[in-house]
Amino acid sequence: MYTGMARWDHLTWQEIGERLTRGAIAVLPVGSVEQHGPHLPVATDVLIPVGLADRVAGALGADDLGARLVMLPPFYYTYAKHSNWWPGTLNLD
């Protein structure tokens, strides 16, 4: 039964070391934090790749490849100058 991909930032340094010796495969979700209108959270562009990565790991299951996947903390930043007018945007400038 699949219980979710391991999250790098939820592991201890010892657990990370063990996974690295077993050939861990890092998954880096990338998205931006910016406005999407009043009906969606500002992290929508991050939540989608995080969910997709978790679904891919679920599809692979507990076989060797699926068990080696570890999700890194998402990269939340982008150049989003067009969204600077709205509160909540995290912009690299």
Regions found by a protein language model. Name each.
Residues Y2-D93:
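N-terminal catalytic or cofactor-binding beta/alpha core of small enzyme domains
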